[in-house]
Curated annotation (Swiss-Prot):
Origin species: Methylococcus capsulatus (strain ATCC 33009 / NCIMB 11132 / Bath)
A Gene Ontology biological process term: antibiotic catabolic process
Catalytic activity field: an S-(2-hydroxyacyl)glutathione + H2O = a 2-hydroxy carboxylate + glutathione + H(+)
HAMAP family in the record: Glyoxalase_2
Free-text cofactor note: Binds 2 Zn(2+) ions per subunit.
SMART domains given in the database record: Lactamase_B
Function statement: Thiolesterase that catalyzes the hydrolysis of S-D-lactoyl-glutathione to form glutathione and D-lactic acid.
Keyword set, alphabetical order: Hydrolase, Metal-binding, Zinc
CDD domains: hydroxyacylglutathione_hydrolase_MBL-fold
Protein name: Hydroxyacylglutathione hydrolase
Amino acid sequence: MLEILQIPVLEDNYVYLLHEPGSGATAAVDPAVAGPVLEALDARGWRLGHVLNTHHHGDHVGGNLELKAATGCTVVGAAGDRHRIPGIDVALKDGEEFRLGSASARMLDVPGHTSGHVAFWFEDDAALFCGDTLFALGCGRLFEGSAEQMWRSLERLRALPAETKVFCAHEYTQANARFAVTIEPGNAALRERVERVEALRREGAATVPSILSEELATNPFLRPESPEIRARLGLPGVPEVEVFAEIRRRKDVFRG
């Protein structure tokens, strides 16, 4: 069973340290900066063997080269993004396996936020590291991909086991919650979740990870089939991707 350490960095990023105790193998997911990662490793006596990158944005790869210089770690990323991942050593294709001691992950292509975005799914640990594709109560902006690409990616993620823990890369949940209730205000589970999110943030506590079942019940970006959402958007009878695209468009201009 993986030990997972969540490290808050920058304004709202999370870096994750994954430690497989049987072998001592350790990986860092999306290290925006190196310093806090090195401090956490030193405090626990862990040795970094790998960096896993979900995409090429600077707040996800900014610590790659410093970590590589300090630890000799191997950088793992998507084959399609090898030209944009600093220090990449191992370029995986969709569905290929990454092993961390006795733990294993499948790399999943999930384009939309960027064209080369991927996620790492540790099935036996019910843990998904999805970068900026799926957020708690939200999803990533479409910087390079289309709404169709992002929707296919989200469909892929929402088909994972409901008990999957969703480790996204940012603490955006409070802002996402304020938008979500404008899209589906009649969702009682959403309203209850918003109250919990607000309480956690008042205490300075993290709202990440979430559970996929919770996202399926409350995240509007995963719920384009909802009759209430369709009615509020004036989009009855259209394909789910069109509903998703309209939700994303509204989120892009939301100020709340």
